[in-house]
UniProtKB/Swiss-Prot annotation:
Pfam families reported in the protein's UniProt record: Cobalamin_bind
InterPro entries: Cbl-bd_prot (IPR002157), Cobalamin_Transport (IPR051588)
Role summary: Primary vitamin B12-binding and transport protein. Delivers cobalamin to cells.
Protein name: Transcobalamin-2
PANTHER family to which the protein is assigned, alphabetical: TRANSCOBALAMIN-1/GASTRIC INTRINSIC FACTOR (PTHR10559), TRANSCOBALAMIN-2 (PTHR10559:SF14)
Record lineage: Eukaryota, Metazoa, Chordata, Craniata, Vertebrata
Cystine connections: C21-C267, C116-C309, C165-C205
Similarity-based family: Belongs to the eukaryotic cobalamin transport proteins family.
Binding site for cob(II)alamin: 104, 152-156, 190-194, 242, 245, 291, 395-397
Entry GO MF terms: cobalamin binding; metal ion binding
Record gene name: TCN2
Length: 427
């Protein structure tokens, strides 16, 4: 009888484990190497380069940057509050070149929670009001019949709701309704995995905070819908959508237990795929690295409801400098076929150059022009050969033959003989 009881207890434990998404420990040296990639970014303290996501996710990781971390938060507060509050009721933006977007404001609010702060006082109320106005504007753009689109994206819409929820600020039911409608199975459009994951995190925060009680049943159903969508999006290799949407998807799945072994199995498979991608050097972009670090520490944005600011974290040390090797010259073909006349040119650059380096060299050679805009994930193209991307258009990067690139112009490094195409596409 005692053995039967022990067996039933063991089966119960295994069953409970199967219901949750757990990521087994990853080699600490690999995690530290990832964190070291962020240190140079933390020296970039201009408003254009400040990235609240770096601070948030470092605080949720097992790593710390000491005084560099403190200076970064101070610079965030100085830059964001002066820029956003200084221009809140004025047309004069002063030194605010590249004023933070509302998505960046939402991330800034997450950064405050990561430091165990709530927005308070007159300044805090203004920031909250700005974010609420942004959500109201997006709600109107979507329309009463839901046939419109947000000016930014449903990703930023969900991020805005999440940020307010983490600061215990309620949003109107009608604002939540737009995100619920977009993610419900009968009338949802095509939303990326990271958009679904961000919406799922927002819904999870609302549910755990007991906000919008009149929508509780729909919120619970939406969490289930998002979980099903993400699990169905798992690739044969194990990624959810693609390698770069997997960390945020895992953040959501870690907050969303379900009966049976499917969830646990899917998360273990994703861990194997992520580990392979890490070893291949796929994570070089600061934003992508920062979203991965909390997952490797078994943390999510939902932990910011009750953040632990006293948890021990390992001090990051700068990576040892490597002796530069003599670099060979490679040839990369750059082409733009979606414009008339088409452009096609072979460009010689150093091995290890990025697409951005190729674009700069093409511009120096003449006959090619382009413009970029800064974002939290790095620069992106807004104009090529004088043709600016219009509303709901963007300049896509492809590797011949017809393979869309997941990395941006500052991250992807073409190999010798590759052809890179810039294509204007609609979405």
């Amino acid at each position: 009888m005692r053995h039967l009881g022990a067996l039933l207890f063991l089966l119960g434990v295994l069953g409970a484990l199967a219901e949750i998404c757990e990521i087994p420990e990853v080699d600490s040296h690999l995690v530290e190497k990832l964190g070291q990639h962020l240190l140079p970014w933390m020296d970039r303290l201009s408003l254009e380069h400040l990235n609240p996501s770096i601070y948030v996710d470092l605080r949720l990781s097992s790593l710390q940057a000491g005084t560099k971390e403190e200076l970064y938060l101070h610079s965030l507060k100085l830059g964001y509050q002066q820029c956003l509050l200084g221009s809140a009721f004025s047309e004069d933006d002063g030194d605010c070149q590249g004023k933070p977007s509302m998505g960046q404001l939402a991330l800034y609010l997450l950064a405050l929670r990561a430091n165990c702060e709530f927005v308070r006082g007159h300044k805090g109320d203004k920031l909250v009001s700005q974010l609420k106005r942004f959500l109201e504007d997006e709600k109107r753009a979507i329309g009463h019949d839901h046939k419109g689109h947000p000016h930014t994206s449903y990703y930023q819409y969900g991020l805005g709701i999440l940020a307010l929820c983490l600061h215990q600020k309620r949003v109107h039911d009608s604002v939540v309704d737009k995100l619920l409608y977009a993610l419900e199975p009968f009338h949802q459009g095509h939303h990326s995995v990271d958009t679904a994951a961000m919406a799922g995190l927002a819904f999870t925060c609302l549910k755990r905070s007991n906000f919008n009680p009149g929508r509780r049943q729909r919120i619970t159903m939406a969490v289930r819908t998002v979980r099903e969508k993400i699990l169905k999006a798992q690739t044969p290799e194990g990624h959810f959508g693609n390698v770069y949407s997997t960390p945020l998807a895992l953040q959501f799945l870690m907050t969303s237990p379900m009966p049976g072994a499917e969830l646990g199995t899917a998360c273990l498979k994703a861990r194997v795929a992520l580990f392979a991608s890490l070893q291949d050097g796929a994570f070089q972009n600061a934003l992508m690295i920062s979203q991965l670090l909390p997952v490797l520490n078994h943390k999510t944005y939902i932990d910011l409801i009750f953040p632990d600011c006293l948890a021990p974290r390992v001090m990051l040390e700068p990576a040892a400098e490597t002796i530069p090797q003599a670099q060979e010259i490679i040839s990369v073909t750059l082409q733009v076929l979606s414009l008339l006349p088409p452009y096609r040119q072979s460009i010689s650059v150093l091995a290890g150059s990025t697409v951005e380096d190729v674009l700069k060299k093409a511009h120096e050679l003449g006959g090619f022009t382009y413009e970029t805009q800064a974002s939290l994930s790095g620069p992106y193209l807004i104009s090529v050969m004088g043709k600016a991307a219009g509303e709901r258009e963007f300049w896509q990067l492809l590797r011949d033959p017809n393979t869309p690139l997941l990395q941006g112009i500052a991250d992807y490094r073409p190999k010798d003989g590759e052809t890179i195409e810039l294509r204007l596409v609609s979405w």
